Amino acid sequence: MKLNQFARLTPDIDQQLKELARIGLPADPQAPFADTAAAMYAAFFPEAYQPAAQQDKFAQVAVNSHQNLAEWLATKPTHMKRADFYNVALQLLGFEAFSDFDLSDPISFMTVTKLPSVAHDLLHTADLLQASYLLLTTRTKHLVSFLDDLANRGFFKDFQAQSSQPAHLLFNGKVQQVFDARQAVREVVWIESDVDSDHDGQRDLLEATIYRPKATDRGLKVPVLFTANPYFHGTNDVTAATHVPETVLAVKPHGASKAEVTAAPASKPKLPARPVTGETKQAAAYAEENSPYAFNDYFLARGFAVVYSAGVGTRYSDGFRTIGGPEETDGAVAVIEWLTGKRRAFTNRTDGVAIKAWWSSGKVAMTGKSYLATLAIAGATTGVEGLKTIVADAGISSWYDYYRENGLVVAPGGYQGEDADVLAVDTFSRQKSGGDMIRLKKAWEQHLAQMTRDQDRTTGAYTAWWDARNYRKNAANVKADVVLIHGLNDWNVKPKNAIRFWQAIADLPIQKKLILHQGQHVYVHNVRSLDFLDMMNLWLTHELLGVANQAEQVLPNVLVQDNVTPQTWSAYSDFANPAAEHVTTTANLKTDFESATDQFSDHATATFTAQHDTSASFEKAIITPNSAYVNSRLWLTQPVLEHDRVLEGIPHLELTLAVDAPTGILSVRLVDLGKAKRFEENAATVGASGLQLGFDFKTTDIVEFKPANKETPSKLITLGHINLQNPKNAYEVQTITPGQFFHVSLDLQPTHYHLPAGRQLALIIHGADMAQTIRPTKVTHYQLDLAKSTLTLPFRI
């Protein structure tokens, strides 16, 4: 186990003493050592209310091999050995003597586990106070810091009752859980947008669900975590809407110019505002939906309000889904504008009684994963005032890069046949309200049919419709600071979405952080080896409470999880910056690779059918040295590596090839060869319900990325796809003459991949990808001129 810690601050001793006093702990370095130790350890068991109960707790803790804590305190000690202090500390952190660590050598265990310690015996009261401060900021076996663990056991449960005016509490630069999340005020409002996405001539009203600390009723203004969550009110069955992968790849007769595929700015109709009949501070509707996002819940107990809005076309709101369209962005922005006092909301949909976000400080962060993070990115690219930061986990930065790739229809990994219209059906939760749907059904079906036409599964081309869903082109508008989190094995929302957005905001005068993990399409707030919650606490305390805690400097610019050594995270100044710490190598496919042939015929669809394969089994088979697809691919290998290398950036291919058809699909996979127990891409549960989000509040599982129990012969590093008629970009088209050689350029998905010595790089070139592209039945023959083809790889030095 490694409990990496990137968010711990080390203030000077005077500041430490002030903070200890602030939370009610001993803080006088002149006080007797024994009295300070007794008071400190008593405070470390907040669940024990009486001295007798405290003595029982002390007796359960070993100080060394011959003395428990009760016995040690009874001696009225004047000092404490370093080993004794950390024997006690480890038990307080949730570790077990005799099974997790040896009482004769706690420091060795702490070093391996990456836990901090003081370097000497505690000879004076000041030493004890300093060591105790460090302990409070140290992570427990249960992922959170020791002070968080104390709070979960009731340390702060009466904190607000002791003051006339509720307030946030800071310790080690982070806001603490001094608010009772169980008493959160739950309410619903309807925000009037400028959007008319269902074309009924009225401004769409957007429902927003609010959870705010009860302390706001006593005058406390709080910042807001806002999650634009299209799934908030449920989803629909999409079986009937899901596309069967097409069997014919259309020949494109012509392309388009850059101007033709550039979306014009969306025009907003001039619609009358609803009349206001009165104003109130009291909501008229209770929030019956529970908060679904543990990350937000964690901050609710720390004095942040949490707001969810599903947006246009969802249950209890107006409008239609537009899947990444400007209407969805505008809907999210409308919520922020209400939270910052610049837009109107109502207590219900009909009587015109207005309500303000009077409890909001006007400082907002957008949070969430996947579609939720996508809308955070979209919101940031508007430059809306009051949005201070986004924490976007696996978000889409261009919808074309989600459903298309280089002129091809390419499904998100694991969702073959999905497209924008399918997701529209999935998230159109207004369908769940029969009374709403009876008057909408025809208009919705017409809207959906138009979306199906606009998305254009025939050509897969980049069009103005997709351009309107490309947030990166508006990246220059971003004013909010940005945290991006993405899985290096996320083939659903592929890494390009994060890295291209990271590059797009690189030169902006904002703070930005990038976290890359070894998972698929998953959250990381509950990954044990990373102090993500503490990192984001430090970040949001700075961003939303205005605390000068050096979050920008303390948190790494880029943090990457290693794919070889478990529970290892490395900090870097940037990602794939060719000007720093990188070297690029270009390999010729003929002279620098070995290959048995330079041609293949793509029988993948027939083989897929004959083998009764699934998308998952195909993805495994296509990168396996000996599989049923051996004749439907080129298999090129480099020599075995003599030393470790770290691939980081965007691999690039320049290919010269010929096909016997006027069009074709080309798929490429870069593969790590060599038997090894590689990481599972889904994190394993290591503590069921082990992460507590507040005192007597919700819990969630603690997870960790672990090596598999069995060896595998290969592992996908990255991949890419291209329509051979789109060798330059996704909108210009070239005519292919069958049998005649032509040139294609292709970027693979960005990656960071540690290749150990003894492994081999393999490049697999094939045709249709049964898991992601359409599935043509026509057999196409491919011949490559390997001598005129290259692979460029960026490596971290």
UniProtKB/Swiss-Prot annotation:
Compartmental location: Cytoplasm
Please report a single Pfam family linked to this protein.
Answer: PepX_N
**Listed InterPro entries:** AB_hydrolase_fold, Galactose-bd-like_sf, Pept_S15_Xpro, PepX_N_dom, PepX_N_dom_sf, Xaa-Pro-like_dom, Xaa-Pro_dipept_C
Look up the EC number in the record and give it.
3.4.14.11
Q: What GO MF annotations does this protein's record show?
A: aminopeptidase activity; dipeptidyl-peptidase activity; serine-type peptidase activity
Taxonomically, the superkingdom here is: Bacteria
Q: Does the keyword Signal apply?
A: no
> Which catalytic reaction applies to this protein?
Hydrolyzes Xaa-Pro-|- bonds to release unblocked, N-terminal dipeptides from substrates including Ala-Pro-|-p-nitroanilide and (sequentially) Tyr-Pro-|-Phe-Pro-|-Gly-Pro-|-Ile
Query: Which GO BP terms apply?
Result: proteolysis
Got a GO cellular component term for this one? Answer: cytoplasm
> What are the alphabetically sorted keywords of the record?
Aminopeptidase, Cytoplasm, Hydrolase, Protease, Serine protease
Checking Gene3D superfamilies in the record gives: 1.10.246.70, alpha/beta hydrolase (3.40.50.1820), Galactose-binding domain-like (2.60.120.260)
* Catalytic residues (positions): 370, 490, 521
Q: What does this protein do?
A: Removes N-terminal dipeptides sequentially from polypeptides having unsubstituted N-termini provided that the penultimate residue is proline.
Q: Which family does it belong to?
A: Belongs to the peptidase S15 family.
Record note on quaternary structure: Homodimer.
* Protein's recorded name: Xaa-Pro dipeptidyl-peptidase
Q: Which organism does this sequence originate in? A: Lacticaseibacillus rhamnosus
Its taxonomic placement starts with:
Bacteria, Bacillati, Bacillota, Bacilli, Lactobacillales
